[in-house]
Design a protein with these regions (language model features):
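Conserved SAM-binding strand-loop segment of SAM-dependent methyltransferases
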Residues: 4-18
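A short acidic, Gly/Pro-enriched loop at the edge of an enzyme's catalytic core
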Residues: 21-29
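Short catalytic micro-motifs in class I SAM-dependent methyltransferases
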Residues: 33-34, 64
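A short glycine-rich, Lys/Arg-flanked "PGG" loop and its adjoining helix->strand segment in the class I
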Residues: 44-56
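C-terminal alpha-helical "lid/dimerization" subdomain adjacent to the S-adenosyl-L-methionine
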Residues: 63-120, 127
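Core SAM-dependent methyltransferase catalytic element
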Residues: 114-142
Length: 142
């Protein structure tokens, strides 16, 4: 963050389930493309830990692969998602990577994740979905 001339931000690469925060509650937590590594049971526990890390009113910004369509649409929507992949891995996910993701990772549904966020004590302030597979949430600790 030094090159961005930001002095009040500390980047802490850490596991949702293993991180032991040594200080006081924080103002902001950002996660990108990490939560889908956990099955839903552990997602809820991870989100509860993030909630506990934030001060009341603190903000959690979550960006991840989240499916925002109905189960009956899954085959067609996943096929379209994979079809829209890039060829150059430097520009994004390739078709092989997206296929592996669906096969091996734990992305969940928007209608599962949103109640999970609320259950652990977050207020969802803003939600955006792109291509039915990428979710961005801005949440506040209540």
């Amino acid at each position: 963050m030094a090159e961005a001339c930001v002095e009040n931000v500390e980047v802490v690469p850490a596991g949702f389930l293993s991180h032991e925060h040594p200080g006081s509650e924080v103002d902001f937590v950002f996660s990108r493309n990490a939560l889908h590594q956990l099955p839903d049971l552990w997602k809820a526990i991870a989100l509860q830990r993030v909630h506990a890390l934030l001060r009341p009113g603190g903000v959690f910004r979550l960006r991840d692969l989240v499916f925002d369509f109905e189960p009956r649409e899954a085959e067609a929507r996943v096929a379209a998602w994979v079809e829209g992949a890039v060829d150059d891995p430097a520009k994004g996910f390739t078709a092989d990577e997206l296929e592996a993701h669906v096969r091996d990772e734990f992305s969940t549904w928007s209608w599962v994740l949103e109640p999970m966020l609320e259950r652990v004590g977050f207020e969802i302030l803003d939600v955006e979905y792109v291509r039915g597979a990428y979710g961005a949430y801005t949440c506040r600790r209540t």
